[in-house]
């Protein structure tokens, strides 16, 4: 990841929360908005972890500690280096666990109590989540499953099978109840 890419990801995460520019209020969000604070330090840490040189390693150590502290404050386990696209938004926080090997597309909205977890063993793996996905409170996405684009996962749903594009999923186990997810997520993504 280049510095320019890191900066773009940070700005797109901020734009999911507000339309203020970085200099016009982004710093305020860094101090007072838990969602932006956790994603900011996650992006900076992910950038520094891929850099070479003693100065970058020293800075990474400091950022790692800041990020770890923010994980404790927010209750969001977001490992540095996890591959997550632009526009990540935690609408509410606490009790959120994201596997470090999960792949998450752009404009993902995650509510409290969500688990995006992997499974060990020969059939193991972690979820691959598409673009413009809303994961409602208490939902669990477990194992090597693919979640399509424009998907809405309802509160408390437990997803252990692949979900196609534009689906709305509810229940335990998660079942597709409609294919108008694109209509539902427009209120969360824009």
Task: Identify what each model region corresponds to.
Residues 1-74, 184-190:
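Terminal amphipathic alpha-helical/low-complexity segments used for targeting or macromolecular assembly
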Residues 74, 80, 85-86, 91-100, ...:
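Left-handed beta-helix
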Residues 180-182:
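Flexible, disordered linker segments and immediate boundary regions flanking tandem C2H2 zinc-finger modules
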């Amino acid at each position: 990841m280049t510095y320019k890419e890191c900066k773009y990801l940070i700005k797109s995460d901020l734009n999911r929360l507000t339309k203020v520019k970085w200099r016009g209020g982004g710093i305020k969000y860094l101090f007072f908005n838990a969602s932006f604070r956790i994603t900011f330090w996650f992006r900076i840490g992910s950038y520094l972890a891929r850099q070479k040189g003693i100065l970058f390693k020293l800075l990474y150590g400091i950022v790692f500690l800041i990020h770890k502290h923010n994980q404790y404050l927010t209750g969001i386990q977001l490992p540095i280096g996890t591959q997550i696209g632009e526009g990540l938004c935690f609408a509410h926080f606490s009790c959120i666990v994201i596997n470090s090997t999960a792949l998450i597309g752009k404009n993902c909205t995650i509510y409290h109590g969500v688990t995006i977890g992997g499974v060990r063993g020969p059939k193991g793996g972690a979820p691959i989540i598409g673009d413009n996905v809303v994961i409602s409170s208490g939902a669990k996405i477990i194992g090597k499953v693919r979640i399509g684009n424009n998907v809405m996962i309802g509160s408390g749903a437990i997803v252990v099978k692949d979900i196609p594009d534009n689906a709305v999923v509810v229940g335990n186990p998660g079942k597709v109840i409609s294919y108008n997810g694109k209509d539902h997520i427009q209120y969360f993504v824009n």
